[in-house]
């Protein structure tokens, strides 16, 4: 069974992941017209959790995320940024961040209620 501390770590890591994914998408969008720029992509959150789970020394709250170059199709100028994909990635990151913060907030509310304090 997942403990409350583990739950906080997972959703804290999910919020950090979403922020990193948003940052990567923003950088890709900002450099969309730069000749030769290769878009970057963040590993999936599932892959991150699997990697961190397999390493007993790794903490999901402090472990870094792997960012790699995208292998998408190249434009004639050597750039491979897809604005449509980046907008989708950005919206997905926003959704993940909102979910993580919502669950985190509700968990804190439950803990406060359990110890007899109101928010």
List each model region and its residues:
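Amphipathic alpha-helical polymerization modules
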Residues: 1-119
